[in-house]
Amino acid sequence: MTLYMVFDALERGKLKLNQRLKVSRRAQGMAPSKLGLRRGQTITVKDAILALITKSANDVAVVVAEALGKTEINFAKMMTAKAKSLGMRKTRFRNASGLPNRRQISTARDMATLARRLIKDYPQFYHFFGTQRFSYKRRTYRNHNKLLRAYPGVDGIKTGYIRASGFNLVASTKRYGRRLIGVVFGGKSAKS
């Protein structure tokens, strides 16, 4: 949903791909998956998109949240409202990164709805989800979505992992003229 909000802001002219977003102390302190941004540094919106897609960078998620919502809590409220407007009836966000929070919840159906709406509403940005590698500050990060490399036709969308729910995946492919979206929650390993 964080990326949906970024694409929405780009579409409405609130952000530009080359715009630089400032890193706060809170963003710097995020763990465990991060780029290692430091307070006072900046990152372009385009690099932020790629870092979120390939690395699931939690520090970058907070940078984006603060740029769009002033605070991460306010941004989470904005995401929840947007989710409801998209028909994601059982989703509540409490942070921008997807890190554990007892009151943050979603369903496979709602994540499939989000994927479908990302593809439909922002086709001009969907290609980012097919990014296999992202280089930033002399480091290269590989996309965690190994299906991009393993299965012809898979063109996105996003992986995730937290201890509470295990390995999660929303994947999409276009075959025989039809778009297929699959959602898996609770995998015991990335391979499963």
Enumerate the predicted regions with their spans.
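Active-site-adjacent loops and short helices of periplasmic peptidoglycan-processing enzymes
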Residues: 1-109
